[in-house]
């Protein structure tokens, strides 16, 4: 199917939706909201297609002028220049439409759960968990997104074994989904007297927040344990048993939350994280199956799970997936990460274009 055929189908779908929205007999709010959502999803495509049709018409008219034996040379020359400009305009619109027509990641618009954990490197890894957490906090402060801390496990040296937080707002998953993976840090620890550079790593998981309709958790499938909250070094930070640990028996997934003073709030947050982890597990299995099928067709393109290196002595950050290096790590750690996240999103689109090209 050519791109024009695809655009014609989208335009027909759009016209059908508009007709239904103008139908006074449709009064169900859920139906109306669903139609409005579908309309907004393809509105930009239809508008760009209208522009394309205008340009194609102008190209046709200019070609007729050039091919007309009665047209004088000066007008033909002007028409040829006009055709050149119009063809460039057409190419720009078509390229934009190819991107708009790409299949959307169904999770892009969802809120997310982010988990940052220690990897290799002991105390240095725990300190870097804190650095990454501050980096994402500052990044989110620069956007219209909102963050809520779900659970933290601080260490005595000021780092974290684990930080879990949620991010809500427009396209939260699309904005941060490329942060999942192993983040490697190279720097001289404060305790290192010899000035040697140490390498450690922390891991980041970005999961779409699952709705109750996405993942159903049965009461008989979970075990809930209540215990007293603890801080760095294991000392008690709460006089009541308000911390909650939930074990999902079918998968063996375990989530705990102790940041709230209320047991009920901790349980609700823990369930939200558990639901996201189950959803992510199911999505990963589905994607692995699709990737396996695709590899059988086009060969393997696996990459290392290490996605990024942060080199503090050189003030350098390198993203290994796109081979981009920036020498402004200080600003990157202050939340200025969009240069790389935008490049990753662009690469995803380019890869999809290559896969879905006509």
Curated annotation (Swiss-Prot):
Q: Which domain of life is it from?
A: Bacteria
Disulfide topology? none
Which residue ranges traverse the bilayer? none
Question: Which residues carry the post-translational modification N5-methylglutamine, per the record?
Answer: 235
- Modification(s) after translation: Methylated by PrmC. Methylation increases the termination efficiency of RF1.
> What GO molecular function annotations does the UniProt record carry, in alphabetical order?
translation release factor activity, codon specific
Cellular location(s): Cytoplasm
The record's SUPFAM superfamilies line, in alphabetical order, gives:
Release factor
Q: What are the protein's UniProt keywords?
A: Cytoplasm, Methylation, Protein biosynthesis
Q: Which GO terms describe its cellular component?
A: cytoplasm
**Family assignment from sequence similarity:** Belongs to the prokaryotic/mitochondrial release factor family.
Chain's role: Peptide chain release factor 1 directs the termination of translation in response to the peptide chain termination codons UAG and UAA.
Entry protein name: Peptide chain release factor 1
- Specify the species: Brachyspira hyodysenteriae (strain ATCC 49526 / WA1)
């Amino acid at each position: 199917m050519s791109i024009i055929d695809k655009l014609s189908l989208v335009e027909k779908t759009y016209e059908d939706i508009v007709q239904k929205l103008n139908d006074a007999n449709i009064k169900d709010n859920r139906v109306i909201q669903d139609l409005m959502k579908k309309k907004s999803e393809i509105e930009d495509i239809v508008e760009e297609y209208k522009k394309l049709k205008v340009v194609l018409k102008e190209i046709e008219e200019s070609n007729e002028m050039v091919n007309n034996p009665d047209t004088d040379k000066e007008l033909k020359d002007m028409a040829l220049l006009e055709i050149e400009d119009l063809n460039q305009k057409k190419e720009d619109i078509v390229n934009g439409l190819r991107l708009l027509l790409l299949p959307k990641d169904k999770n892009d618009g969802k809120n997310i759960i982010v988990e940052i954990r220690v990897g290799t490197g002991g105390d240095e890894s725990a300190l870097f968990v804190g650095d990454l957490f501050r980096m994402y906090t500052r990044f989110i402060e620069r956007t219209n997104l909102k963050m809520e801390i779900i659970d933290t496990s601080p260490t005595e040296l000021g780092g974290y074994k684990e930080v879990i937080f949620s991010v809500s707002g427009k396209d939260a998953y699309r904005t941060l989904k490329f942060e999942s993976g192993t983040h490697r840090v190279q720097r001289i620890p404060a305790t290192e007297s010899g000035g040697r550079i140490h390498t450690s790593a922390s891991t980041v998981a970005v999961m779409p927040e699952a709705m109750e309709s996405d993942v159903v958790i049965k009461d008989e499938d979970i075990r809930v344990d209540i215990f007293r909250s603890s801080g760095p070094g294991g000392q008690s930070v709460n006089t009541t048993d308000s911390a909650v640990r939930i074990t999902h028996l079918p998968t063996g997934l375990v989530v705990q939350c102790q940041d709230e003073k209320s047991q009920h709030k901790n349980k609700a947050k823990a369930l939200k994280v558990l639901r996201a982890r189950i959803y992510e597990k199911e999505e990963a299995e589905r994607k692995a199956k699709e990737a396996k099928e695709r590899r059988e067709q086009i060969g393997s393109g696996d990459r290392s799970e290490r996605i990024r290196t942060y080199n503090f002595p050189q003030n350098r950050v390198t993203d290994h997936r796109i081979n981009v290096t920036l020498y402004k790590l200080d600003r990157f750690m202050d939340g200025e990460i969009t240069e790389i996240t935008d490049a990753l999103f662009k690469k995803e689109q380019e890869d999809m274009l290559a896969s879905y090209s006509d």
